[in-house]
UniProtKB/Swiss-Prot annotation:
CDD domains: Kunitz_eppin (cd22611). Transmembrane segments: none annotated. This is Eppin. It comes from Mus musculus. Its main location: secreted. Expressed in differentiated spermatogonia in testis. Expressed in spermatogonia cell lines GC-1 spg and GC-2spd(ts) as well as in the Leydig tumor cell line MLTC-1 (at protein level). Expressed specifically in epididymis and testis. Expressed predominantly on the postacrosomal region of mouse spermatozoa, in Sertoli cells, Leydig cells, and round spermatids in the testis, and in the principal cells of the cauda epididymidis epithelium. Serine protease inhibitor that plays an essential role in male reproduction and fertility. Modulates the hydrolysis of SEMG1 by KLK3/PSA (a serine protease), provides antimicrobial protection for spermatozoa in the ejaculate coagulum, and binds SEMG1 thereby inhibiting sperm motility. Residues 117-133 are annotated as: Interaction with LTF. Residues 26-73 form the WAP domain. Residues 77-127 form the BPTI/Kunitz inhibitor domain.
Length: 134
């Protein structure tokens, strides 16, 4: 196939993605789960086993020492600190985007969001390196 034919197909896909909305674009160019090395203090309970266990735009990803539903388009490190609704007492780390550092907080054990890491090093691996690139 000539280069002009290839470029024409790419332009067509781009136009279709705008007309059909994000679902066609997601099928053609699927998003991936975040990848980084993590040294877990303990394995967390899996909250999903496959993508269809998750809400529509989320994928079942190995993340932060367990499987969790994540939206690959969402910047986890920009989420606010969220202790959750339960009354347990877990020392965790969250990434504070305002000062680009990982900070300790107390997690209640349920709900909350994915800006919630077992250790400072996992938080730094997931967020600080990415923050320094932007």
């Amino acid at each position: 196939m000539k280069l002009s034919g290839f470029v024409s197909i790419l332009v067509l896909f781009g136009l279709l993605a705008r007309v059909q909305g994000p679902s066609l674009a997601d099928l053609l160019f699927p998003r991936r789960c975040p990848r980084f090395r993590e040294e877990c203090e303990h394995q967390e309970r899996d909250l999903c086993t496959r993508d269809r266990d998750c809400p529509k735009k989320e994928k079942c990803c190995v993340f932060n020492c367990g499987k969790k539903c994540l939206n690959p388009q969402q910047d986890i490190c920009s989420l606010p600190k969220d202790s959750g609704y339960c009354m347990a007492y877990f020392r965790r780390w969250w990434f504070n985007k305002e000062n680009s550092t990982c900070q300790v907080f107390i997690y209640g054990g349920c709900q909350g969001n994915n800006n919630n890491f077992q250790s400072q090093s996992i938080c730094q691996n997931a967020c600080e390196k990415k923050s320094s690139l932007t």
